[in-house]
């Protein structure tokens, strides 16, 4: 573990969102699995030291809006959503104000959302704490340190948990850190 305080880790800074509105089938199915796992945290991650684990889940849908330049791609994504039973609803941009009267629909070709508690967010630090506690109970050992180099790796599958620092360790792996920006907007309840 590079930093056991997690001061510079990405996860405590994230919003802990889980959703299923993706383009690829695999991501949609991962989103569905995540939701089911999150609902089962109290049972799955219970430990002797943490008998009541939680991630403070807030089930709330995501509204994704698309202009004309991205509408066709989203219509194709909706076919995957339907095939995966993702529960995604589509709204024509011209009808957006019927569902969300406080949103300016100008320039919006289509929008998608869920209202079946299949998406939302969690407290990522609580979730991490519950996962770590369960891992320790099952024998995992967390060691403070930092991998500086690797001599040779012979494996069918390799999982790098270095996140945005992967490139520093594995130069041939095409992972580039990206900065994400989140805006919080307070809207009236509908």
Regions found by a protein language model. Give the residues of each.
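Central helical "cap/lid" subdomain
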Residues: 7, 155-190
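Short beta-strand
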Residues: 11, 54-58, 174-176
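Dinucleotide-binding Rossmann-like beta1-alpha1 core, especially the glycine-rich loop
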Residues: 15-99
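Helical element adjacent to the flavin cofactor pocket in flavoenzyme catalytic cores
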Residues: 113-157, 161-162, 167
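Short amphipathic alpha-helical segments
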Residues: 12, 77-78, 170-172
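Short hydrophobic/aromatic beta-strand or adjacent loop that forms the aromatic wall/cage
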Residues: 60-62, 109, 178-182
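Glycine-rich FAD pyrophosphate-binding loop
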Residues: 1-11
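Short, flexible, mixed-charge acidic loops at enzyme active sites
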Residues: 9-15, 102-106
């Amino acid at each position: 573990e590079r930093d056991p305080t997690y001061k510079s880790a990405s996860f405590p800074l994230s919003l802990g969102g889980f959703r299923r509105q993706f383009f690829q089938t695999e991501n949609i199915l991962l989103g569905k699995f995540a939701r089911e796992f999150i609902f089962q945290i109290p049972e799955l991650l219970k430990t002797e030291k943490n008998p009541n684990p939680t991630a403070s889940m807030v089930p709330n849908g995501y509204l994704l809006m698309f202009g004309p330049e991205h509408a066709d791609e989203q219509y194709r994504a909706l076919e995957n959503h339907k095939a995966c039973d993702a529960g995604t609803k589509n709204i024509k941009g011209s009808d957006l104000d019927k569902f969300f009267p406080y949103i300016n629909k100008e320039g919006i070709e289509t929008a998608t959302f869920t209202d079946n508690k299949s998406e939302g967010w969690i407290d990522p630090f609580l979730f991490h704490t519950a996962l770590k506690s369960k891992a320790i109970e099952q024998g995992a050992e967390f060691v403070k340190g930092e991998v500086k180099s690797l001599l040779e790796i012979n494996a069918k599958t390799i999982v790098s948990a270095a996140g945005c620092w992967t490139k520093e360790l594995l130069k041939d792996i095409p992972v580039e850190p990206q900065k994400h920006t989140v805006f919080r907007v307070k809207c009236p309840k509908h």
